[in-house]
Regions:
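N-terminal auxiliary interaction/assembly segments of multi-subunit proteins
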Residues: 1-151
């Protein structure tokens, strides 16, 4: 895996969770965060100079917290709104990560987020972000651009 890809993915994720989800990433993943169970996954596909998919999984009770923070609500919103919020997080992370990888002149088309299905390919980059008592796992898959996938 490329260190640059992981760095750009981590940077985009931490900024998005801070700015959009009002969550402060922890510098290290502790045991509780590491053992937190996956509660939801979404993915976004992208096409441009290279194509691929970003998968975002949240673990440890983060889904209702993220949605409530984004919507400015005290109580957890409906499951549908929780998944919409996570989809928006994935979309923003992807949109912020791609220029860091490819440069600001390249144009990408990012699809609407969807509930994630299993992916049989190995990711070209994978990072974990500690958030409160849980964590987010971010996996980047790339196709149609062999040089990037081999970095």
């Amino acid at each position: 895996m490329s260190k640059k890809l992981e760095t750009e993915l981590y940077k985009a994720a931490t900024l998005t969770f801070e700015d959009l989800g009002f969550l402060l990433p922890t510098p290290e993943i502790d045991e509780q965060q590491l053992n937190a169970q996956v509660e939801a996954s979404v993915s976004v596909d992208f096409e441009g100079p290279f194509s691929g998919k970003l998968l975002v999984r949240v673990c440890g009770g983060l889904l209702p917290i993220i949605a409530a923070n984004m919507l400015g609500e005290e109580d957890a919103p409906s499951k549908s709104l929780q998944y919409d919020a996570l989809g928006e997080i994935a979309n923003v992370i992807c949109g912020n990560m791609l220029p860091g990888i490819a440069g600001s002149k390249d144009v990408f088309h990012v699809s609407s987020p969807k509930m994630a299905e299993s992916i049989d390919l190995p990711p070209v980059a994978e990072v974990q972000v500690g958030l409160g008592l849980g964590r987010a796992d971010l996996l980047l898959f790339v196709s149609k651009y062999p040089a990037l996938a081999e970095e």
